[in-house]
Structures are given as structure tokens and as C-alpha cells.
């Protein structure tokens, strides 16, 4: 599939999702220069990455799972990126904690692009109001994230996300995983999980 990537004129960042893997399995990637890693759970990430980030400040750790408000203060200590901002309550908590600790993560607004009740994320029709609310809270919103429905073709959802990112002038787009990354790249994904 690397040959497929050569057909595309951009180089999206690949987030190696390292959840459940111990550092001795991850170190070979770090030794070869990979710097973007994703975790789903705050506690696991804090235990795994806190010390190594002190030694290797170039590492960028991404929260790719849901974030509960009671975990925000811990999350800000280790995560450089949060891909799952999906509520005003969470936005307020991140704003409060980043002001206290003088840490400002880069944040993706999670869009429930398939309008699925079992998934997090804000509805498409809420994006403008929610984005403006986040800006008032001094959050560093850099783009959007989505997980398209598994049972459907991802292209139509990625196309919609690409439209939204252009409309709001977002520079970054977090979408695409191992099963649909080529389609995501075609619709301007800048981060792949």
C-alpha cells in the first residue's frame, strides 16, 4: 500500500496507535524516528509516556479515545493532541485546566458524521456554534475528527468532512484508519490513526 501513497501529493501524519503495547514494543518505532503515537486511555498513557517524553521532547502523544471531564487534568500532562472534543462541558473543563497548568493542547472537534447514537461527537449542524464557543474558551482548535459508520462506504463521510474543514478553514483533519486510510487521504486527511 505504500505505492498507493506515492500517488498522493501530500504526506499525512500517521499516528501509531500504541494502546495496550508496552514501551519495549514501541521503542523500535521511536528509534526509527516515528514521533506520533495514539492512546485511548488517559491512565495508561500517563504511566507509559510521562518519563520518556522528558527524555524525548519531540514525541507527540495523541488522545484518540473519549475523554471524561474527571480525567482532563491528567490528560493535559501527557497529551499534545486531543482528537475527541465532543461537548461544551468537556470544552469548559479543558479550558479551566489549561489555564491552571499553562498547557495548551491542540484539539480536534469530534464530529458524529454518521449521526450514530452509539458514537460521541457533535452533530454537523452544531459545529459552527460549538466552534465559536470553543474559541471563546481560548481552546486551540486545529481541526475535526470523525469515525464514519463501519457498515457504510467511508467516502461520502470523508467528503462531507473535507467540505466542513474548508468551510471553517481548519488546517487539520483526523480521519482514516487501517481499513479506509486511502479514501481519507483523498479527502484531505492530515492525520491517520
Task: Identify the function of each model-found stretch.
Residues 1-172, 177-179, 187:
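Conserved alpha/beta-domain cores
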Residues 190-192:
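Divalent-metal-activated hydrolytic enzyme cores
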Amino acid at each position: 500500500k505504500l505505492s498507493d501513497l506515492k500517488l498522493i501529493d501530500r504526506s499525512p501524519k500517521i499516528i501509531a496507535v500504541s494502546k495496550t503495547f508496552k514501551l519495549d514494543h514501541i521503542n523500535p518505532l521511536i528509534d526509527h524516528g516515528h514521533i506520533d503515537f495514539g492512546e485511548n486511555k488517559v491512565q495508561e498513557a500517563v504511566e507509559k509516556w510521562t518519563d520518556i517524553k522528558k527524555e524525548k521532547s519531540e514525541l507527540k502523544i495523541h488522545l484518540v479515545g473519549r475523554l471524561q471531564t474527571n480525567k482532563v487534568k491528567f490528560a493535559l500532562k501527557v497529551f499534545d493532541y486531543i482528537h475527541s472534543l465532543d461537548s461544551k462541558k468537556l470544552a469548559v473543563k479543558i479550558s479551566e485546566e489549561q489555564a491552571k497548568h499553562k498547557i495548551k493542547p491542540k484539539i480536534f472537534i469530534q464530529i458524529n458524521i454518521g449521526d450514530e447514537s452509539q458514537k460521541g461527537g457533535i452533530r454537523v449542524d452544531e459545529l459552527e456554534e460549538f466552534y465559536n464557543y470553543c474559541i471563546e474558551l481560548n481552546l486551540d482548535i486545529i481541526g475535526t475528527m470523525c469515525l464514519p459508520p463501519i457498515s457504510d462506504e467511508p467516502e461520502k463521510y470523508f467528503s462531507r468532512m473535507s467540505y466542513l474543514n474548508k468551510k471553517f478553514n481548519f488546517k487539520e483533519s483526523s480521519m482514516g484508519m487501517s481499513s479506509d486510510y486511502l479514501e481519507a487521504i483523498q479527502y484531505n486527511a492530515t492525520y491517520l490513526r
